[in-house]
Amino acid sequence: MEMLTAICGCVMAVQSLIAVSVADDAYAREARAFLANRDKTVQPRQIAEIRKAARGETNDLAAVRSARNVMAALPEGVTAEWVTPKMRLYRLQGKDKLPLLVYLHGGGWVIGSIASCSAFCGAVAKEGVAVLALDYPLAPEHPYPAALDAVCSAYREIVTHPSRFGCDPNRVTIGGDSSGGNLALTAALALQQEGLKPAALLPYYPVTEARVDGTISWREFDTGFGMDGAFMEACNAAYLQGRDWADPLISPMCATDDELRKLPSVHILGADHDVLRDQGKAFADRLKSLGCRVRYELPRGTTHLYITVPGQPSVFRRAVQFAVEACLQSDRKN
C-alpha cells in the first residue's frame, strides 16, 4: 500500500512537471510571436515624447497616450459602471458584497488609462471578483505624489462607503501592472501610516526601484523585449522630477524591514524577459526573508505588457487566475 501511494505521488509529480513545461512552452512561443509582430516604431516615439513632455513640451504626448485608450468589450454577464469619472467598477450582474480588486494600470505613470487594462478587469470580474479600475493622474503634468495620493484616496472612499462599490470592505485587494504594481505597493506603505491595511497586494512585473538598477535582467533585456530600459528611465524621470528615487513611497524596496513586515500578503507575477524581472524577484526574496506572506511566480519566456497589450494569451489567462486566487484568499487580518 505504501509503495502504491509512493508511485501515485510520483505520477502526480511528473504530471505536474509536464503541465508546467507545456505552459512554459506556450508562454515562450507566444512571447516570441508578440515581439516579432510588434510595431518597432512605437516605443522610440513614446520615449521621445515622454522626454519632451518632461521638459514642458506636452503638446504631442496626447497622441502617444491615445494609442492605449481603447476600451475592450465586456464579457457576457459582466457590467461596468462609472462610479465617478475616474473610477470604473466591473462586476457580475446582480452580485453584491464581492471581494474587490482595485486595479491600477501600467504605463510608467505617464501613459495608459482605465481603457488599457479593461480586458483584464472584465476577465477578472467574470470570475466573481469585482474590479475597480482607477484613472489616476499622470506624469509629467502630475508628478509624484499625485498618483499615489489618488490611489490612497480611492481606497479610503471604498472602505468608508463599501455599499457604493458593492464590495466587502474586509476583502479589498490593491493590484496593478508595472508602474501600477509600484503604486499598489507604495499605497499599502502609505496607508499603513494611517492604520489602514488592504486585504492583499497583487503587483504584476512591478517597479520596486525607480532607477536603472544594473541587474542582469536590465542589461540582458534592455532593448527589444516589450519595454526598453530607456522607456523606463524616461518614465522614472517624468514621475520623480528630481525627487529621491530611494524614497520608500517611490521605491518600495527601500522601505524598512518593519514597514515591509506590516504589509498584507503580497502576490507577485513577474515577466521573464523583462528589465524589471530581477528587481521584482529581489523584492519577493526580501519579503520571504522577513517572514512575510508572499507568493511569487515567474512564467518562463514571457515579456512585459501581457496584462495591457494583447498577444500573450496564455500568460494573460494565468494572470487572471492568479488575481482571482489572490482576491478569494484575501483576509484583512493577514
Where is each model-derived feature located?
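Alpha/beta-hydrolase superfamily serine-hydrolase fold, recognizing
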Residues: 20-334
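Bacterial Sec-dependent signal peptides at the C-terminal "C-region" and cleavage site
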Residues: 8-23
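Bacterial N-terminal signal peptides that target proteins for export
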Residues: 1-6
